[in-house]
Swiss-Prot record:
Subunit field text: NDH is composed of at least 16 different subunits, 5 of which are encoded in the nucleus.
Name by which UniProt lists this protein: NAD(P)H-quinone oxidoreductase subunit 2 A, chloroplastic
Bilayer-crossing regions: 24-44, 57-77, 99-119, 124-144, 149-169, 183-203, 227-247, 295-315, 323-343, 354-374, 395-415, 428-448, 484-504
GO molecular function, one term: NADH dehydrogenase (ubiquinone) activity
InterPro entries tied to this protein: NADH-Q_OxRdtase_suN/2, ND/Mrp_TM, Ndh2_N
Gene name of the encoded protein: ndhB1
Protein species of origin: Eucalyptus globulus subsp. globulus (Tasmanian blue gum)
Length: 510
């Protein structure tokens, strides 16, 4: 009899949970329509892969790319709608979150065609690769709109788990396995530190988990200037620093970049930074509103360390991917300037604008590396010597992307950095901007060193890799070249395109 009653109670509880979930999805689901499109694409991929004996690879790519493009379209149609807090306060939709979601979708859309030829040549499993990419994209999108501590923790874990699986996708590669283990262990440690910081924030606010309610809770408990908040700030900064590859939490980055498949590195190098930057901006700006001086100081120190260490160590690298790893550490230091400046002096607009340009510059560079690696099998910087004599198109594309990363005019990277540094200067961050300018000059040195190798390699310096290089004709169906051309064009757009981009970015208020 007791068992029968308990069983009935369990059924009733399960029914209530199901009805509540159905109610939330029915009334709030329209606000996450772009995410629902990706979920539908994931289910469709799984169904086709499970039921079909013959793997129609072009069809898998088509479904993935179409899902991403449709999600972007749905996101654009939702632009300028009223901000909404949905799913019982777990998720928020506004222009600020949606522009970061757009950037993540743009990254994934460009990364899929960049991966096609690489996966075919390495004989990697295509379905799982696309599933991990779409799931990571979904996790990044939910992180951008996360409005409570639980979602802010669960969403990046979804992204991180897919990142671990993608970085170790070439199971027979010893370097890939080593990189995955380091990434997994350090990622787990950083997540633990982040959760510990959240627990201090949760306790200090009187048990609140929503970001805005945490602020109200801190006011009610009079704990907004307590040591507990400073401890929470310290732990959360360390956890976010790992996600952003900020020094000194950057040790995993070079090994993961070098050991992972190159298309995976291209994907992780941009999407992780976009999602983590969106989350960091909201975490620091809302719950730590009363500790703005403290987190400004912390981020300034981390930004200076990242810009100096990243660019100085990049000079000594012999691997293209390791060089880009240290370069990305320096680049995220520039992005931090926009987060510190905030919305009052156009900091968020400059950060978003620079991130848009960084996506095109970085993915364009990685597209060139993927193409060169497939044709030569090497990643060493010295092996690029004299590439211009064999493949002028690839050499010029790589040179333009590197010059844009360095911030030379009249390329997009120059105007992005100029606007970012100008906003920092207006906000009074004179020392931070000066360090940024100095390290930008240092970065130009190692980028120009590579370009000199590309263009002026003498016959005796040309390695067998380039000497035996066979340039395939430019084909309309070469997806890597398609991604490369799109990124190169976006990286070389002059300042004439800046005004509309900045105008759109300035609308991204909370």
């Amino acid at each position: 009899m007791i068992w029968h009653v308990q069983n009935e109670n369990l059924i009733l509880d399960s029914t209530r949970i199901f009805m509540k979930a159905f109610h939330l999805l029915l009334f709030d689901g329209s606000f996450i329509f772009p995410e629902c499109i990706l979920i539908f694409g994931l289910i469709l991929l799984l169904m086709i892969d499970s039921t079909s004996d013959q793997k129609d690879i072009p069809w898998f790519y088509f479904i993935s790319s179409t899902s991403l493009v449709m999600s972007i379209t749905a996101l654009l149609f939702r632009w300028r709608e009223e901000p909404m807090i949905i799913f019982s306060g777990n998720f928020q939709t506004n222009n600020f979150n949606e522009i970061f979601q757009f950037l993540i979708l743009l990254c994934s859309t460009l990364c899929i065609p960049l991966s096609v030829e690489y996966i075919e040549c390495t004989e990697m499993a295509i379905t799982e690769f696309l599933l991990f990419v779409l799931t990571a994209t979904l996790g990044g999108m939910f992180l951008c709109g996360a409005n409570d501590l639980i979602t802010i923790f669960v969403a990046p874990e979804c992204f991180s788990l897919c990142s671990y699986l993608l970085s170790g996708y070439t199971k027979k590669d010893v370097r890939s396995n080593e990189a995955t283990m380091k990434y997994l262990l350090m990622g787990g440690a950083s997540s633990s530190i982040l959760v510990h910081g959240f627990s201090w924030l949760y306790g200090s606010s009187g048990g609140e988990i929503e970001l805005q309610e945490i602020v109200n809770g801190l006011i009610n408990t009079q704990m907004y200037n307590s040591p507990g908040i400073l401890i929470a700030l310290l732990f959360i900064t360390v956890g976010i620093g790992f996600k952003l590859s900020l020094a000194p939490s950057h040790q995993w980055t070079p090994d993961v970049y070098e050991g992972s498949p190159t298309p995976v590195v291209a994907f992780l190098s941009v999407t992780s930074k976009v999602a983590a930057s969106a989350s960091a901006t909201r975490i620091f700006d809302i719950p730590f509103y009363f500790s703005s001086n403290e987190w400004h100081l912390l981020l300034e120190i981390l930004a200076i360390l990242s810009m100096i260490l990243g660019n100085l160590i990049a000079i000594t690298q012999t691997s293209m991917k390791r060089m880009l790893a240290y370069s990305s550490i320096g680049q995220i230091g520039y992005v931090i300037i926009g987060i510190i400046v905030g919305d009052s002096n156009g900091g968020y607009a400059s950060m978003i604008t620079y991130m848009l340009f960084y996506i095109s510059m970085n993915l364009g560079t990685f597209a060139c590396i993927v193409l060169f690696g497939l044709r030569t099998g090497t990643d060493n910087i010295r092996d690029y010597a004299g590439l211009y004599t064999k493949d002028p198109f690839l050499a010029l594309s790589l040179a333009l992307c590197l010059l844009s990363l360095g911030g030379l005019p009249p390329l997009a990277g120059f105007f992005g950095k100029l606007h970012l540094f100008w906003c920092g200067w207006q906000a009074g961050l004179y020392f931070l901007v000066s360090i940024g300018l100095l390290t930008s000059v240092i970065s130009i040195y190692y980028y120009l060193k590579i370009i000199k190798l590309l263009m002026t390699g003498r016959n005796q310096e040309i390695t067998p890799h380039v000497r035996n290089y066979r340039r395939s004709p430019l084909r309309s169906n070469n997806s890597i070249e398609l991604s490369m051309i799109v990124c190169v064009i976006a990286s070389t757009i002059p300042g004439i395109s800046m005004n509309p981009i900045i105008a759109i970015a300035q609308d991204t208020l909370f």
